[in-house]
């Protein structure tokens, strides 16, 4: 219960694929636009509403839309407006790519608490560990531009690896870390949408809006 109360002070603002699967060598960028505010990402990139890239996310993985455009997101300066990915009810999100991908992996992130990302050979975080990244807390460092949203610093990070990866484990404190422009096949994150051919009252990404939502249940 204590963890639940902590979570609602996070990334939500207090202040207010039927197409062929992606080849393992293709460079793909996931921006999460179109998933919808606080909706599960789930199979969106596996033919359920978005491009069919053969990419699935664990049930805890949610999309979050910037409060500037009517969502509950407590963030600013996101690399591709206006949606990011985060998790609220767990301390990790799992991404699976059944066909696998090679070369590298990269993304932008913003975090109030440290996190980790691990790349695995098998699905669901199984098999050999191919690469790992430690993510430092940096959510409000040297922010400029967009004045609304506590999570205003988005850092690009990536890693190259040998072999074929099929899953990624995004770890961190629930509601205190967000991700955007997740990129497969490159250790430099993309800053463009997915191609068709291929107020510090609350430090979390979601705040009072989510608290009210739970109270109604």
Regions found by a protein language model. Give the residues of each.
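Surface-exposed, well-ordered secondary-structure segments
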Residues: 26-190
């Amino acid at each position: 219960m204590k963890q639940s109360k902590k979570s609602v002070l996070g990334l939500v603002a207090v202040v207010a694929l039927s197409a062929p699967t992606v080849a393992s060598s293709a460079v793909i960028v996931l921006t999460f636009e179109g998933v919808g505010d606080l909706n599960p990402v789930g199979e969106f990139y596996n033919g359920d509403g978005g491009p069919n890239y053969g990419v699935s996310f664990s049930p805890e993985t949610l999309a979050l839309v910037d409060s500037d455009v009517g969502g509950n997101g407590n963030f600013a300066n996101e690399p591709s407006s206006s949606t990011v990915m985060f998790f609220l009810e767990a301390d990790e999100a799992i991404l699976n790519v059944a066909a696998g991908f090679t070369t590298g992996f990269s993304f932008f992130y913003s975090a109030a608490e440290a996190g980790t990302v691990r790349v695995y050979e098998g699905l669901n975080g199984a098999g050999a560990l191919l690469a790992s990244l430690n993510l430092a807390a940096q959510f409000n460092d040297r922010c400029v531009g967009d004045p609304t949203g506590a999570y205003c610093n988005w850092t690009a990070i990536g890693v190259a690896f040998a072999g074929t990866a099929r899953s990624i484990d995004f770890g961190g404190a629930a509601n205190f870390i967000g991700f955007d422009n997740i990129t497969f096949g490159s250790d430099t994150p993309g800053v463009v949408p997915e191609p068709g051919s291929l107020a510090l009252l609350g430090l979390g990404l979601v705040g009072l809006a989510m608290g009210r939502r739970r109270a109604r249940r």
